[in-house]
Amino acid sequence: MNDKLSYYKQQVGSFLRQQPGWWMQYINRCIDDQITVNAGYLAYVTLLSLVPLIAVGVAIFSAFPGFESTRLAIESFLFTNFVPTSSDVIKEHISSFAGNANQMTAVGIGFLAAIALLLIRNVDATLNRIWRIKKKRPMMISFAVYWMVLSLGPVFLGGSIAVTSYIVSLVSFADQGIPGFSGFLLKLLPYGISMVGFIMLYTLVPNTRVSFKAAIPGALFAAMLFELTKKGFALYISHFPSYEVIYGAVATIPILFVWIYLSWIVVLLGAELTACISPENIEDTPEIELDEQENTKDTL
């Protein structure tokens, strides 16, 4: 265990001691890919798709009455750990909208699912642009992947939260030997879940092979930046509540939009870091481009 820890420390130290030109390359990639513009577009699509996503998730859990408590646990966990402030107000409004959506017909539910799939498709397209991937997946495969994420995502999320809660309950017994150990573990839990989510996003979504060695530093960077952004945003809103004077009763909407925008910037910064340090950049060149390069060489 100590050998592995020292190995990772050496790798991180070597990574940080690299020439400044690497960081300039990273910054230039972020500028060239216009991550602030893409984050704004994804924030708009997310705000449009948020209620449909929740409505579809509620519909999936409604099909399994035994998972009602799990659905409530997921809602509580997400709003507590991933929304920096005003979570009660936001949760009340979104749950109300999703509840009204559940009263729609099958055609209406299908329309909501299409809007939710729109978000997943745009995330896929944005990450593929970051990895410079021009080759698209076949339409049927893309639809199958998107639908699997939409339908199985809430189930896997509920299962992971249930397993995590069980592990934390077991670890709480360690407080007898190490006071406050379970509380310390609970503080690390959002970091761990965020990091796992970022690793899955950076390795599974791009239409190329992304190694875990490249995804782990990017996911760790994104998870830490996400928590810092969440704390900073909550601190700003708590101490500078001028937005309530300007927007009044609808202040929750711009707050939610700004937070989603900042969250997407963090996601894209982590993706840029992962793509920049990925050792498979040459191997990951799309097959179409590789064929063109080989034909050019043969001609020369």
Swiss-Prot record:
Keywords for this protein: Cell inner membrane, Cell membrane, Membrane, Transmembrane, Transmembrane helix
Keyword presence, RNA-binding: no
Membrane topology: Multi-pass membrane protein
GO CC term, one of those recorded: plasma membrane
A Pfam family the protein falls into: Virul_fac_BrkB
Statement: the UniProt record of this protein carries the keyword Membrane: yes
Primary location recorded for the protein, binned into one broad class: membrane
Subcellular location, record wording: Cell inner membrane
Superkingdom of origin: Bacteria
Annotated TM spans: 47-67, 100-120, 143-163, 181-201, 215-235, 249-269
UniProt-listed HAMAP family: UPF0761
Family: Belongs to the UPF0761 family.
PANTHER family: INNER MEMBRANE PROTEIN YHJD, UPF0761 MEMBRANE PROTEIN YIHY
Protein name: UPF0761 membrane protein PSHAa0171
Organism listed in the record: Pseudoalteromonas translucida (strain TAC 125)
